[in-house]
Every structure is written in C-alpha cells, then in structure tokens.
Amino acid sequence: MNISILGAGAWGTALAMSLAERHAVMLWGRDAAVMQAAQQARENAVYLPGFRFPDKLLLSSELGAAITHAGSDGLLIVATSLAGLRPLAMQLKPYAIPNLVWLCKGFEEQTNLLPHQIVHEILGDAIPAGALSGPSFAQEVARGLPCALAIASDSEALRERVVHAVHGPAIRIYSTDDLIGVEVGGAVKNILAIATGIIDGLGLGLNARAALITRGLSEITRLGVALGGRAETFNGLAGMGDLILTCTGDLSRNRKVGLGLAQGKKLEQIVVELGHVAEGVRCAQAVRQLANQHGVDMPITNAVAAVLFDGESPRDTVKRLLSRESRDEIA
C-alpha cells in the first residue's frame, strides 16, 4: 500500500520507519532544510536522533508529492501536533483526499474542538477519516518494540484499511467506531499525566500515584460520555492504556511538566527545557471549560488547571484535593 505520513516529528518519523518495512512510505515535513538534512543523513537528527531510516523510506518537503504518492486508494496519516492540524487541513483542501487518519491528540485552543471536528469543518464529512491512538512512545516504536493502538472511525472500510496497513509483527491494531471516546481519552490523559508528575515530584508515593490514575480515569470517562463517547472505550487502549503509559513513563513530556512544577519551576522555564509546550498544557484550559459547560465533576483536571493558570502552588492544590469529602466510588 502507498502511505504518506504528513509530519516529520518523532512520532511521524517512527511510524514511517516501522511501516516502510512493508509498504511504500513517504514522510513529508514542511521544513525543506530539515528534510534535506534528514535525506542526506538518513536520520531525523532533529526529532528522532540515533535511528537510521530504512533504505526504502522516501522523504519530501513537497505536500503535493506526498498526496500524489498516496494516490486514490492509499493512506494519508497526519502526524502533526494538534496545533498544526488546522493549517495542514487548509492546505489539503484543494486536493482529492483518499483516506485520512490523524495521530494528534487534544482539544484545540480557543475553539475547544476535537481533531475530527476540525477535519470535518474544513474538509467535510464525506472523506473516510479517523484517529489512530493508544499507548505509544516514538522511541520504542522506532526500536521495533511491540505496542498496540486503536483505529477509530465511522467508516468500516477505513478501519479495515488501517488494520491492513499498520497491523504487523510489532504493532497490533484494534478497531472501534467510537471516534469521540478515543479522542477524548487521548486528550485528557495528558492533563492527568501532569498531575501524576506533580504527585511524583512531591514524593507522595506509589499509593497516591495509583489512586490519582484510577480517579483520573473516572474523570476521563465522565467527560467522554457527556461529549458522546461510550464508557467502555475508556477501559481500552485509547483510555486506560494511554493513561497508564503517559502517567508512568519516563519519556512522557506531560509527566515532566508535572515534575518540574513540583520542583518549583515556572511553566515558562519548563517549556524552554522541553523545547515545546506539552499537549496537556494546551488542553487543560479547554477541558476545564468543557467540564463546566457540561456539568461534569473533574477535580483533578481543575486542580492541574489551577496550578498552570491560576497561580496555585502544587502542594496547596494537592492538600485541597485530599480535603474533599468522601463520595461513592462509582458515580
């Protein structure tokens, strides 16, 4: 199958490397200088250093070439950040898009839209489209280590196409038609990873970490159901699976934000050290607003937003969380 991956960051590069072993894959990046350097070195030294490209992997900085490569029955996979999805979708608008899948997670700043809502707004809803999500660190995928992902789409044909293209020795693919549930799980888990980083950074122990992750999953489920997702989706790869990895993995950028906040660092300093804003930071304000709009109780999410945007100290915020009255666990 012809596959074009649009976005040459760490995750897009890792997936391109994995799929190039079995398919005709082109990796597109908007920065011509970065792509030329990657072509010459056969390595993405900027975003995924130390991993040599398969010989068959094609690279380009020409969007038209990437779309032509995918052809009428191939697959376009968008691997930009969520902030890059709207401008890229605008660039795709003049083209005939065959099948579209995105990897980005979150709610768009200002609009509070999920990725599929952005895509439908710009490209319409006639294109077979969906989200590929789940617990996956780019470095491990690039190393060929096993992982499992979920493809979510209203189109059964697209789900089958993605399973055919991506499912293989190192990547298992499970399919669902709950696009909203998968996208909400992928978005909110980043906020909870910041909370887990705060817990770990304050030295509050593994018991507290486990409690936070568990109660965090309840928050994700409540919001997801309120927005139209199905409760059972959040027990799967895009919910529980992604949450566990992002909250506990040492490669998690969002967890690093929480660790930095617990150490007394300012958010601006943490962003400089990371080199970019973690998606949980972008997402926290949107989720707080959505929870208020839909009357969803999300104390952990609200606590993270208070630390990020309202000037609360991590330690005081944790004390406030722990002072909440007891309640039924399943509610």
From Swiss-Prot:
Quote the record's binding site residues for NADPH.
W11, R30, K105, A138, R253, V277, E279
**Which cellular component terms (GO) are annotated to the entry?**
cytosol
Which reaction does this enzyme catalyse, per its entry?
Answer: sn-glycerol 3-phosphate + NAD(+) = dihydroxyacetone phosphate + NADH + H(+); sn-glycerol 3-phosphate + NADP(+) = dihydroxyacetone phosphate + NADPH + H(+)
The UniProt record lists the EC number as: 1.1.1.94
What highest taxon heads this organism's lineage?
Bacteria
Q: Cite the active-site annotation.
A: K189 (proton acceptor)
Q: Does the keyword Protease apply?
A: no
Q: Which family does it belong to?
A: Belongs to the NAD-dependent glycerol-3-phosphate dehydrogenase family.
Name by which UniProt lists this protein: Glycerol-3-phosphate dehydrogenase [NAD(P)+]
What high-level taxonomic lineage is stated for the organism?
Bacteria, Pseudomonadati, Pseudomonadota, Betaproteobacteria, Burkholderiales
This protein's gene is called gpsA
